[in-house]
């Protein structure tokens, strides 16, 4: 009798991410991930409850690629570093990145990122309600730009123009924040 392949949640998510990177998000099915891991589809259910849980796991995996939120450095510089990390993640995983726009940000890693952004904004002088709103608006703008770039919307422009546009977006966002301090 053959030996049963041992898999883990990490292996399941890595296989799903690799499959999406190679063939697109539509190719990510429980059967396709199982084939990639040389197991039966039922073996996956020990690690992910269903397709929605698999997609939520992919969101978690993408979020772990962001720079770890730090308390060091200026609050606005930390936000720029995070925005740059988000954009880099979108470039690495253009097929999967749109999940960040459609899946609820309720996982522990999503909350960690959201809380770090809100903490930086509070450090910059925004009170709690405004920090939460600013986080939503900033996240929407940065995720939208990164998703647009990853989807090829800007492909007819030189990369230097796209890079400058992203830097300008971040400057606009910084100027829009009602916090004390000089605008970089």
Task: Map each language-model feature to its residues.
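C-terminal peripheral helix-coil segments that are non-catalytic and often amphipathic
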Residues: 151-184
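Short, basic, alpha-helical segments at the C-terminal edge of helix-turn-helix-like DNA-binding modules
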Residues: 60-65
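Amphipathic alpha-helical packing segments from all-alpha helical-bundle domains
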Residues: 82, 101-137, 164-167
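Amphipathic alpha-helical core segments of compact helical bundles
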Residues: 139-143, 147
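Hydrophobic alpha-helical connector segments
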Residues: 67-106, 135-138
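Residues in the recognition helix of alpha-helical DNA-binding motifs
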Residues: 47-48, 134
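Basic, helix-initiating cap at the start of DNA-binding domains
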Residues: 1-32, 36-39, 49-56
């Amino acid at each position: 009798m053959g030996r049963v392949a041992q898999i883990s949640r990490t292996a399941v998510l890595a296989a799903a991410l690799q499959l999406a990177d190679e063939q697109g998000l539509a190719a990510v099915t429980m059967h396709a991930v199982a084939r990639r891991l040389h197991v039966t589809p039922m073996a996956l259910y020990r690690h992910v409850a269903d397709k929605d849980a698999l997609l939520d796991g992919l969101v978690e995996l993408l979020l772990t690629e962001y720079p770890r939120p730090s308390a060091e450095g200026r609050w606005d510089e930390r936000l720029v570093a995070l925005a740059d990390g988000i954009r880099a993640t979108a470039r690495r995983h253009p097929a999967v990145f749109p999940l960040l726009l459609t899946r609820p940000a309720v996982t522990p890693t999503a909350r960690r990122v959201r809380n770090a952004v809100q903490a930086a904004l509070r450090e910059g002088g925004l009170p709690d309600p405004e920090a939460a709103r600013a986080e939503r608006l900033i996240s929407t703008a940065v995720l939208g730009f990164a998703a647009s770039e990853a989807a090829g919307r800007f492909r007819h422009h030189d990369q230097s123009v796209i890079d400058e546009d992203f830097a300008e977006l971040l400057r606009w966002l910084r100027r829009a924040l009602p916090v004390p301090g000089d605008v970089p």
